[in-house]
């Protein structure tokens, strides 16, 4: 981040859909673990928040993770993913700092658990299709502009 914050005033973090393949917690969270578990993600996000706040002149936009199509995940994994992204929006993200969220997961799922079939490349492929991408592109653009204009804490997290 030291290099990027020296070059950019706004930095956007994006995850690919495998971030949503969340396994059950073990009761032994580990910030250094590469295991995809809510307990680990929360510690990692808290560490990331501390680091990002050490660059107050830079604004950071964190996408909620991408959803998976129903055929590519289990209901339990999808529920854990939604639980984590809800925590990111409602608890981790705090007003008044330099960190903002774009709720991509909400756009993909429309409040459900899975990437909607009509937004996916196919019922087996969790990549967003061209039609959905064309719908989402102006929304992330609007979200970025809202953050730049100082409206990041009051504007819609989806860009709608």
Task: Place the predicted regions along the sequence by residue.
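Oxyanion-hole/transition-state-stabilizing segment in secreted/luminal serine hydrolases
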Residues: 1-38, 65-70
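Surface-exposed acidic, glycine-flexible loop patches that form ligand/cofactor-binding
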Residues: 1-8, 49-55, 146-154
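Amphipathic, non-transmembrane alpha-helical secondary structure
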Residues: 2, 39-46, 50, 138, ...
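Loop/turn elements at helix/coil->beta-strand transitions in domains of secreted/extracellular proteins
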Residues: 6-12, 53-61, 95-100
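Active-site segments of SGNH/GDSL-like serine hydrolases
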Residues: 17, 48-83
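A surface/extracellular/periplasmic glyco- and lipid-processing/surface-interacting theme
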Residues: 31, 35-39, 43, 53-58, ...
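Well-ordered, non-membrane alpha-helical segments in soluble/globular domains
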Residues: 32-48, 77-88
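Catalytic His-Asp segment of secreted/periplasmic serine-dependent ester chemistry enzymes
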Residues: 68-160
